Every structure is written in structure tokens, then in C-alpha cells.
């Protein structure tokens, strides 16, 4: 209601990112299937490398990573600007995904990712969901408020 443009952009970016998320997991699925049927590890590794280095796969994976990072930050800004939650909830959501990228890719640390990456994202969105559930029926479908 109070931040429809940024909320729409955040949602669209996240949708696009998660739609391309299969580009991240496809090599894992392929590797598992080929090893499961008995292919040798060297040829499976070579095939997976070819798949991961293929331009559409690289573009999809990169779009997923950048999109879910940017989309989460946009949604965090939107829920704060719309006054759905306090600023610190938006900060939790906005910071959680950069922490996830660092803890999952740059400095692999599963505990950091679970607690401050996806864990913080979960807590932030749970707080947003709680606020939405507490919103009175008459507050829905109102015209945007002027700034």
C-alpha cells in the first residue's frame, strides 16, 4: 500500500531469480543420476563441468544468485517503507542474503549460513508474516497513500 512500486520490483526480481534456480542445482542432479547408473567419476566430473560452463547455465546461475540477493533487499526496503514492520526487521532481511552469499560461497561456513543467512531470513519473514496476519480486514485493498 505505501510502497507498491518497490514491492512489485522486489517480487518480480525474486520470482525471476527463483525460476532460474534450477540452473544452480542441475549439475548436482545430473551428477547424482550419472553416478547412480554406474558411470565413472572422471567422466561424470567432465560432463558436469561442461554443463556448468555452458553459457545459458552460467547465465541462469548468475541471474539466480544476483536476483535473490537484490530481490530480498528490495522486499526488505518495501516492508519497512510500507510500515509493515519496524526498520530492524527490514535490516535483518536485507543483511541476511549477503551473509548467505558470503557464508555459502566466499567462506563456506554452514553454521554461519544457517544462523545468520537463511536463519535470519526465516526470522525476518516470520515477523513480516505475523504483521500481515495481524492486519485488520479493512486495511486491505486501500488506495496508495501519497508520500
Where are the language model's segments positioned?
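Hydrophobic, aromatic-enriched alpha-helical segments typical of multi-pass transmembrane helices
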Residues: 1-147
